[in-house]
Amino acid sequence: MFQLQNYALGEWVEGTGPKTDLVHAVTGEKIGETSSHGLDFKAMLQYARRVGGPTLRSYTFHQRALMLKRVAIALMERKEEFYPLSSMTGATRTDSWVDIEGGIGTFFAYASRGRREFTNERFHVEGPTEPLSKHGTFVGRHILVPMEGAAVHINAFNFPVWGMLEKLAPALLAGVPCIVKPSTTGSHLTHAVFKAILDTHELPKGALQLICGEARTLLEHVEEQDIVAFTGSAATGQKLKAAPSIMAHSVRFNMEADSLNCSILGPDAVPGTEEFDLFIKEVTREMTSKAGQKCTAIRRSIVPAGLEEAVIAALSKRLGSTTIGDPTVEGVRMGPLASRGQVKSVASSAEAIRAAAELVYGGGDFAVVGADREKGSFFAPELLYCADPLTRLEPHDIEAFGPVNTIMPYRDLGEAVQLARMGRGSLVGSLVTHDPKVAQEVILGAACYHGRMLVLDRTSAKESTGHGSPLPNLVHGGPGRAGGGEEMGGARGVTHYLQRVALQGSPSMITAITREWTKGAEETQDSVHPFRKTFDALQVGDTLITKSRTITLDDVEAFAKLSGDTFYAHMNDEDARSNGVFEGRVAHGYFVVSAAAGLFVDPDLGPVLANYGLEKLRFTKPVYPGDTIHVRLTVKQKTAKDTPEGTIPQGVVEWDVEVINQHDEPVAVYSILTLVRRGEAVPVTPQAA
């Protein structure tokens, strides 16, 4: 029997007063209880802001990313502990894999992105420098800094692990402490994974808190620096979003709500094609995976008029082979709903849809393997058919959050798009077609009503992640009924927990704040070549002005012969003049870059270990034989790298390169990246206190 405690103010706390029962979805038996009565929600928010926040913000993005990675590794080592707990929610092994290992995967994904897409700083510089004055003495730049409040995460019952981890990953990477409020249904699984995270001792005090029971007055205490992220029904989300405290303090509220997602069968995908079979397989999977309890599940199947009978027959056959029962029994492909309350809710919603649709599959007795159908929360798949979906709104307005799907016909692509849009905003829509013209018309016609759209055909099917799978590197959310919010999406998900600030000032001031050299800022020159300096000795703004080199016609011809690039503008004076761009034969741009390297590189063995990249290259003016060039090389940014045991301590130095001609005009501008030896290893992520 689980006695679920809450985790508040750095301690496990058992709720007082009446408790809520936790029930096994398969057997109907009580498996535990929990309560949040007695918790001081205001104190929990203050603890997160005053204890967890300052410590998390003292870490750099890279340190927080490594923290996530170590937590993810630890959770993967313990993953098998969570599968039996997941089966109690009605999830099959496959369902649980998506929830458990998919959730842990978001931590791995954000750990990787945190080190690749953010610098090793406590803030993030966004976008290019914006010139704001004629002479360059006044410029602008955007930076992102962590919000100094707490993130309140209110999660749904259908994914107890993924629902928690997909919100925690970007928030913790941003440096914001979190209070997790899972649905009480299934909270025994959330509780176990949460405790496993604490067992790693990777997170600092105050970084995480957990409420297993009701949240009651929690949102009454949020303030302007807090963030609320909600996943659940549209009705509940809209009610919470309108809370007086949310409105009064303009609290960021990200809402991801269940929606009437659709899948469209293209007119080319007739029976006998691979695409028709893919459509049948995808709709069936979305109806039976998690017993249809997914916010991304297909609720509306939009098919060409005339193919309804074929689609109904194929879906009925495939659904008929789906074994329902105890998910721990071998061969069972679909488990029960999460609770008896869900059974009543789904049945009621399906009945309401049937006011506009005919039941064409399901609805009668069904067999259950390894369990008692009356005691468990079982509900068999149902297929409905709406013959007039343009005038009957029930299938577009009512969601049965379970294995229920409504088939509806369209006469042309314009009508298919119209039906897709009638969901009034969806998390995801899919189109099954092998015709690029169909894909273009449908996707561009329906895109503004969707957060994500999948085009599925024979080419992508083998590797496709499917209609219902949100991915950490793509946005998850949708307009309108879907909540109007957005989660994940790679670095975008992190920015929801950061404040964007527009900076204005002189280039030197902006450089001092961002620690990234801005053109026009002060430069430092000395007698030591910058390639002779270690990473630690180099300073942002260190600059080398090279000697000059005059480019000759022999240089151009030699480079053409060596590279094989004999483009006419380099080799024929008359042809070069004829194109209206050049005044005559012009040097290869890549020769200019190579010649520039010859001017600024120090060739001897030293701290520079390797050149591993060139970015943002632009050729701003032609270089003709007889022109003389030199280079201004400036340290633009430094990023210390983590130093695994046995490797050379190093960091990445980004250099601003400007190649200049004899008229003091830039002819090429770009950045190069070098690995430079450090004097000492980078400290590992600070350990939790």
Each language-model region and where it sits:
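N-terminal Rossmann-like NAD(P)+-binding subdomain of aldehyde/semialdehyde dehydrogenases
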Residues: 1-136, 183, 321, 338
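Rossmann-like NAD(P) dinucleotide-binding subdomain of oxidoreductase/dehydrogenase enzymes
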Residues: 118-278, 410, 463, 485
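ALDH superfamily catalytic-core signature
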Residues: 200-201, 225-227, 235-390, 412-414, ...
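Hydrophobic beta-strand-centered segment that forms part of the acyl-chain substrate-binding groove
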Residues: 578-587, 591-637
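Catalytic strand-loop segment that frames the active site of acyl-thioester-processing enzymes
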Residues: 526-587, 678
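Conserved C-terminal structural/oligomerization subdomain of aldehyde/semialdehyde dehydrogenase
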Residues: 27-32, 66, 202-205, 224-227, ...
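Short, well-ordered beta-strand elements within core beta-sheets of diverse protein domains
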Residues: 18, 31-37, 53-57, 131-132, ...
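HotDog/MaoC-like acyl-thioester-processing domains
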Residues: 530-540, 623-689
